[in-house]
Amino acid sequence: MKTSIHPNYNDVQIICSCGNTFKTRSTIDKKELHLDVCSSCHPFYTGKQKIMDSAGRVEKFKSRYASFKR
């Protein structure tokens, strides 16, 4: 078996935008990983519908098509 071919497996602190944090292990080189959604705030797991738009895509869409009427 070859030695030293696997990446390092590090402890990582996961931080969600909702404030939830937890620790896991990963091969990334960072100590912290920031997420937009996690299982505590994702609509599938919470059962609540909400628009999750962190990049302003909904507002951009509405402004682009505001002149069109049904």
From Swiss-Prot:
Gene, per the UniProt record: rpmE
Pfam families reported for this sequence: Ribosomal_L31
Keywords, alphabetical: Metal-binding, Ribonucleoprotein, Ribosomal protein, RNA-binding, rRNA-binding, Zinc
Family: Belongs to the bacterial ribosomal protein bL31 family. Type A subfamily.
Disulfide bonds: none
Identification of the protein by name: Large ribosomal subunit protein bL31
Superkingdom field: Bacteria
UniProt-annotated binding residues for Zn(2+): C16, C18, C38, C41
Cofactor(s) it depends on: Zn(2+)
Entry GO CC: ribonucleoprotein complex; ribosome
Organism this protein belongs to: Vesicomyosocius okutanii subsp. Calyptogena okutanii (strain HA)
